[in-house]
Amino acid sequence: MNQTQPYMDVHSSHLSSAQPYASHAATAGAMAHYPQYHQQPPVLQPASTYGPASSYSQYAYPSGVASSQTAPPPPSTSMSSQVPAQLLPLPVNSHTVTAPGYGNTTGTPMQGFVYDTTGQLAPPGAKPRVTATLWEDEGSLCYQVEAKGVCVARREDNHMINGTKLLNVAGMTRGRRDGILKSEKVRHVVKIGPMHLKGVWIPFERALEFANKEKITDLLYPLFVHNIGGLLYHPTNQTRTNMVVQESQQRRLEGPPSARTPQASQPPALHHHHSMQTSIPSQMPQPPTMSSQPGARPPLDRAHTFPTPPASASSLMGLSNQSSSYDWNNQGMNSGVPNTQPLSIDTTLSNTRSMPTTPATTPPGNNLQGMQSYQSQSGYDTSKPYYSTAPPSHPHYAPQYSLSQYGQPMPPHSYIKNEMAPPAGRAPGGQSETETSDVKPADRYSQSNGHVTAGAGESAPEHESEYVQHDNTGYGASRSSYTYTTNTSVGSLAGEHSQLTNDITGSPQQNGSGRMTPRTGGGPPPQWASGYASPRPTAASSLYNIVSDTRGSSNGAGSENYTVASNTAPTYSMGGSLGSGKRGREDDDMGRPDSQGDYESKRRRTNETTVGGPVGGVLLGLQPMKAGGAMPRRR
């Protein structure tokens, strides 16, 4: 009679309120201990219906409708754990059979037993072990029968049977099994879901044929019983069966399985959503723990009522104006909120309930100091938000990096005179502004983007004065930032791309934009040698000033229409003279087609309206500004 002990010990997990079976059966030496259960009605109420103690050997399956041992489906175990103990056992016959040896486990017909090919008749000694599981993915109830440690399932709606598990019971090899199942005309392949439901599902008739062919029909009893639900609807087991069926019908009415959540985790999730979005439920037990610890941080067991804030939540929640009613350290806990009114906490944080708040609802806290310091340390004018795109790699150039590149239509003279002080090294050699205006215009005709894009309605002489003044500041600043040696012999490098005409390079200088394209960029300015007399490399240098801002401190600052400041030819043609200026003009005339007549007239007019008179006087004025006393290369 002790053969039932290991079975009951194994299946103790399926007994919801009958744990004393396992504990006593493990220690009991004989069946004499079982009459103790008759004196324990609180533990097992229906003990009087079990009969004498000897009937336990006949009832070898204490979890009659619980799931099997090897492949327990999750829904059935949860169902059986919720059912009272009096619903579990099935009434048994009076024949005495040992627990493990029911039915035919050999795979061969028993002696004296007519083999039932229909699967309707129970083999001698076999008991209908059927479990029902709700298959959520398919929305159907599944009847499950275990044989040889394999759980074979059958659907309730179309009565298809898992052929993969069926042939596994037969001990068939994988290759042969898959070959047979692939040749089936009607089959349903399931690849997602519980393990015992995966596989190839075949119709009921084909499954019965396979079972008869492999001689496993009696092993699978009652899988092929037509009214398999009747075995589940046992009178003693009626309540549990109704629970399973009602749940399956309720699941069908609820809709597709994707919209459903597991039954066990649903109520906490709903409470969590209510506590996050609406007022905190008063029936939740956590708010008293909030005020029971007035001086400490809120405990972690309040996860359902209010989330514990992250480390940086003090700036996210904007406690500058809300810390009086709720603070995470010690203010909100003892602020006089009763245990029954946790709603004040909820109302103070209603607008910042979603943790990543936007700056629209968050006052500037500590997290905004990073942006403010970024604007202040790079020296931008905070009233002009378009400065924020300036590259921060040259922070000391940032104040002058602005208006010409970011579309401010401010006139050049007003910006220079009002907003920017002249640099210290403005006129090297003690030169005055009038001398500078004498000096500049001689070579300014060679700069191809001179003032074609002058502002509408502004005359050229106005621009000349401002332009010369602006060039002088750019010249002085560029002299301080870059010291060009007088005898660098890299003229050939610069000449390779700086002598290209502006039509070849397609510069936008002639169309009035005043900006350079990367094709006209040429090379970096240190490559333009001092002895190279043509002043056109300065046109290419304007792109370098726009892009990298490593030239003068006022390069991009002056005007919308003329971005480069250090565009005077003497900056680069150090060894130039009157002849070099003439040569630049001749080259300019040769390289320019006839289609640019308007620019030609503009250029000559700026040349005619110079302040300094003849060109020779200009070259005399240039002498103090040269970097060195190098002799002219040619005349």
UniProtKB/Swiss-Prot annotation:
Pfam families: KilA-N. It comes from the Eukaryota. The keyword Transcription regulation applies. Residues 1-21, 63-82, 246-480, 498-635 are annotated as: Disordered. GO terms for molecular function: DNA binding. Induction: Induced at the onset of developmental competence and highly expressed in competent hyphae. Residues 129-235 form the HTH APSES-type domain. Disruption phenotype: Impairs the ability to undergo asexual reproduction with abnormal morphology of conidiophores and only small numbers of dysmorphic conidia exhibiting precocious germination. Displayed reduced expression of the catalase gene cat1 and hypersusceptibility to hydrogen peroxide. Impairs the production of ergot alkaloids such as chanoclavine-I, festuclavine, fumigaclavine A, fumigaclavine B, and fumigaclavine C. Impairs A.fumigatus immunoglobulin E-independent mast cell degranulation induction. SUPFAM superfamilies: DNA-binding domain of Mlu1-box binding protein MBP1. Residues 276-294, 312-325, 356-380 have a biased composition (Low complexity). PROSITE patterns: HTH_APSES. Residues 460-469, 583-592 have a biased composition (Basic and acidic residues). Residues 163-184 bind DNA. Residues 582-605 are annotated as: Nuclear localization domain. Keywords: Conidiation, DNA-binding, Sporulation, Transcription, Transcription regulation. Residues 326-355, 498-513, 539-571 have a biased composition (Polar residues). Signal peptide: none annotated. One of its GO terms (biological process) is sporulation resulting in formation of a cellular spore. Transcription factor that regulates asexual reproduction. Binds the StuA-response elements (StRE) with the consensus sequence 5'-(A/T)CGCG(T/A)N(A/C)-3' at the promoters of target genes. Controls the expression of 6 secondary metabolite biosynthetic clusters including 2 involved in the synthesis of alkaloids (fumigaclavine and fumitremorgen), 2 clusters of the ETP class (gliotoxin and an unknown ETP-like toxin), a cluster predicted to produce pseurotin A, and the product of the last cluster is unknown. Controls the production of ergot alkaloids during conidiophore development. Belongs to the EFG1/PHD1/stuA family. This is Cell pattern formation-associated protein stuA. It comes from Aspergillus fumigatus (strain ATCC MYA-4609 / CBS 101355 / FGSC A1100 / Af293) (Neosartorya fumigata). The lineage of its organism: Eukaryota, Fungi, Dikarya, Ascomycota, Pezizomycotina.
